[in-house]
Amino acid sequence: MTKQTLTQLEQHDLFLRRHIGPDSNQQQAMLNFVGAESLEDLTAQIVPESIRLSQDLSIGDSCGEAEGIAYIRGLADQNQVFKSYIGMGYYGTQVPNVILRNVFENPGWYTAYTPYQPEIAQGRLEAILNFQQVSMDLTGLDLASASLLDEATAAAEAMALAKRVSKAKKANIFFVADDVFPQTLDVVKTRAECFGFEVVVGPASEAVNYELFGALFQYTNRFGQITDFTELFATLRAKNVIVTVAADIMSLVLLKSPGSMGADVVFGSAQRFGVPMGFGGPHAAFFVARDEHKRSMPGRIIGVSKDARGNRALRMAMQTREQHIRREKANSNICTAQILLANMASFYAVFHGPDGLKTIASRINRFADILAAGLQAKGVSLVNSTWFDTISIKGLDVAAVNARALAAEMNLRFDADGTVGVSLDETTLRTDIEALFDVILGAGHGLDVAALDAQIVSQGSQSIPAALVRQDAILSHPTFNRYQSETEMMRYIKRLESKDLALNYSMISLGSCTMKLNAAVEMLPVSWPEFANMHPFSPLDQAKGYTQLIEELSTWLVNITGYDAVCIQPNSGAQGEYAGLLAIKKYHESRGDAHRNICLIPQSAHGTNPASAQLAGMQVVVTACDKQGNVDLDDLKTKAAEVAGNLSCIMITYPSTHGVYEESIREICDIVHQHGGQVYLDGANMNAQVGLTSPGFIGADVSHLNLHKTFAIPHGGGGPGMGPIGVKSHLAPFVAGHVVVKPGRESDHNGAVSAAPYGSAGILPISWMYIKLLGSNGLKKSTQTALLNANYVMKKLSEHYPVLFRGRNDRVAHECIIDLRPLKEASGVTEMDIAKRLNDYGFHAPTMSFPVAGTLMIEPTESESKVELDRFIDAMVSIRAEIAKVESGEWPVDNNPLHNAPHTMADIMDPEFDTRPYSREVAVFPSAAVRTNKFWPTVNRIDDVYGDRNLMCSCAPLSDYE
């Protein structure tokens, strides 16, 4: 008979115990090793007393998985998912179950990281290369990115690219056609204001009347009209105007490509290629440009290179354009994109193939033809004379139509001028068309779908003008014509997955990235139709479940951060930085201080910080760090005083990017405030703050939170992410608003930073579940365990590698940096060699050469057990012994298992291997753990220089398949 209490038997803390890697016995052993009596004792040794919270969080108690699921099921049931015909960039779609089950719900795909280590990421790199090929084929242009955040932010990136590359250097006007989606215009205006661009909005034909550097057109437009822009684009390009086009990906299956009309840049949302609406996201945007603009492209680009054996291998190309290298001179601040969703869209194209896509697109268009024919037969006037999927109607009794629509549980588009819009999609059925006739015309209309279809087949359709019907073939590569059976598709997805190392195989200890557990129970609600299938512009009274979830999550985040308000809209951490800086900018402007435009940034900052400051129209001034990695207070005081009249803010990270809690953090905040500036605290390292301290308590004014780091949203192989911002009350009126959905906040009048009002709302249930299940105590214990794991790893490795930075009591925060520069100097072994050798041991390398070149930054998170930590430590110790053999001369510098890493099956099958000074066993089975569970890299070390000098960012030529 157990003596446990009923409360103990109910196991309300079971999720907490499963989320945290080390069990109680392991924790005690680790505490003993690092020299602490308890987690509280360790916390007291590490976190400065002056910033330690005296009270616990007020989130509530932890709860069990069943209880959490029951509660969020109640929220989901409050959402009324009506049939949506709103369109405007968001459409119903059928997610193929083979993709839903094997990609979207598969940790092998959603727990991987951005493929900075391409040798162990060849699977998702191939999937993204497929996405780029789809984008290029459909748009008719030369070079595609790996994905952007959404269609509206892609439009803003297109505008920025246009300014960079246009030969009309004196022009400062960007023209936007007045029939683009309103949310796109909203985001473009927000970005243009920061850059000092003038945005002119008008009919497309009027673009020729202005001196422009760029112009934006919608194809098809918001009303459904399809326009042949060939002559207009030629006229504009003759005037050195960069022509950008927002295009509907499904319509491009049937329509003449914008590239063939003369467009320079084409972008849009890939959402309707098998990705649910999710109340606004996440969705991947495609972005394609002419080859001549490749150096000015934003975001990730996947390219083809070769490995050390000369075999074809994939990698991220032209990274010198990006924020982690070019900082404030980068083309964009993009870090996290939407790789998981781009993968889904690419698999959708692979699974359906060109014929299947044409059938789907043709069916959508046929239903639109039938709807239009029936309405016109009853004397209804249409706004548009051509269409792919959208019919816009004028002259209706809007109130009556809306009442009938709501009674039939459907949402139409109602414009302010009385126009009613209907956008059809892949999910539309015959019965839906019949219901639409009833709603628009009232009962007794006598229309018959079959008869109307027969009429269209007999007479032909003019909805797509003959000159705009696509004539060229699309998706002719074998990849898009070979996997149309589910068996083959399932195996193709599995084959790619097996090439990638993700959290479902081993720890990914990337510093500043927080690769923690993404628990299955947290992921479950994301697939529920009540969350997945809601249109972001649905009436808010139909989204009561989402509204309550967002309100509860926001309240929790306010408590966790110590701020007064939260804005959920930014759909990545970098977007959160941009949104936070905009709030600061608008705050200064409201006080008559528009001249305050200088942003102080420590030299150790993340690359997104200076890139975001530049994006917000600020001037970056770099402040020095001392030998301990802390902000140099003397330099900060000097520079803050020098720029005091124009100081806007400082951007700092806490704990610092060097992995320590700076004792002077409050003094840093005070210095900036005394000179009239605001404090932006980067939330990248929030996993070392939750429950112990907070940005608001420290003295910051605004922060973004990486929900895909601290709050358990998976990284998805490079996205999705979420970057909501927390602000003090004086900044709350200046956070992002939205032109379409206005929930009644004081910031509603502000411009948007993302296409959807709540950003990627579809993944918010993950963070809601994470916080709900852990509760106040669990959140704090997670942070404390992250500190324990990091200090355990640090102390173990310090016996073999120098640790670069430590804080009070020789402790680190949640991550540590080991210095490889002395070893490199003594042996010739580089940090790259060690990173690639870790692949042979079954590990993704820690963060390399950030924030200091020649180092590795290790962040184990709270989710890794002592067993896994010891396996990683053993690998690093073994690698140190291998380096010693190079130092001693036993192995040549240019022929050893580190220099030749990673090793593949082809290596050990090669008869030439016998000429190497080490055995096959040393190459591929360097530890006992690897012998029982081996991850095989599928390519050898990739030649980055070759890839950039011979740029190829599309699927292999057909000759490779012959």
Swiss-Prot record:
Question: Pfam families given for it?
Answer: GcvP2_C, GDC-P
List residues, modification N6-(pyridoxal phosphate)lysine. Answer: 709
Q: Does the keyword Oxidoreductase apply?
A: yes
Q: Which domain of life is it from?
A: Bacteria
Q: Could you give a single Gene Ontology term from the biological process aspect? A: glycine decarboxylation via glycine cleavage system
Q: Which enzyme class? A: oxidoreductase
GO MF terms held by the record = glycine binding; glycine dehydrogenase (decarboxylating) activity; pyridoxal phosphate binding
**Which SUPFAM superfamilies does this chain map to?**
PLP-dependent transferases (SSF53383)
Required cofactors, per record? Answer: pyridoxal 5'-phosphate
Listed under GO cellular component are: cytosol; glycine cleavage complex
InterPro entries, per the entry: GcvP, GDC-P_C, GDC-P_N, GDC_P, PyrdxlP-dep_Trfase, PyrdxlP-dep_Trfase_major, PyrdxlP-dep_Trfase_small
**Catalyses which reaction(s):** N(6)-[(R)-lipoyl]-L-lysyl-[glycine-cleavage complex H protein] + glycine + H(+) = N(6)-[(R)-S(8)-aminomethyldihydrolipoyl]-L-lysyl-[glycine-cleavage complex H protein] + CO2
Recorded E.C. number(s)?
1.4.4.2
Alphabetical keyword list = Oxidoreductase, Pyridoxal phosphate
Q: Which family does it belong to?
A: Belongs to the GcvP family.
User: What does this gene product do?
Assistant: The glycine cleavage system catalyzes the degradation of glycine. The P protein binds the alpha-amino group of glycine through its pyridoxal phosphate cofactor; CO(2) is released and the remaining methylamine moiety is then transferred to the lipoamide cofactor of the H protein.
NCBIfam families under this entry?
A: gcvP, PRK04366.1
Cited PANTHER family: GLYCINE DEHYDROGENASE (DECARBOXYLATING) (PTHR11773:SF13), GLYCINE DEHYDROGENASE, DECARBOXYLATING (PTHR11773)
User: Partners and quaternary state?
Assistant: The glycine cleavage system is composed of four proteins: P, T, L and H.
Can you name this protein?
A: Glycine dehydrogenase (decarboxylating)
